């Protein structure tokens, strides 16, 4: 299967080990020898501004570590109105719901050019059985996603629009390097 936006490049061991988001990525705690065995399954995927990384209802076959850029996760109201439910930034994990066997629950749309590492779920599942620390890291990623969602609900979806925009700009300034 072709990965949308894939450069078709397998990231080398050296690139992965020196990656700027390695310290916060899903596989941050893996032993280097374990890392050496599986890294060839990861593909670099670049998506242009406005393009979709995945869509609501698609079968979740991969999770994506965001290396650069911002992705908005959107859902739709019954009348078709788009609602941004979360923004993902460098170091975040997109498509995490796929780890439960679920389809993707959002449209993931690039707000900027994004660079990601596409990690097959089969790789995540295989490593989770032999590397217990991966389970803890995955739970931590879930907790981060839940905290971010809570923050969006309390800070960015209530109050006058002027204040919501200000809070969004503050969030962007604090959470992005772009």
Locate the predicted segments by residue.
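A generic structural signal for short hydrophobic patches within well-formed alpha-helices
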Residues: 93, 124-125
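Conserved short-loop catalytic and cofactor-binding motifs
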Residues: 22, 57, 153
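Histidine kinase transmitter module recognition
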Residues: 45, 76, 97, 127-130, ...
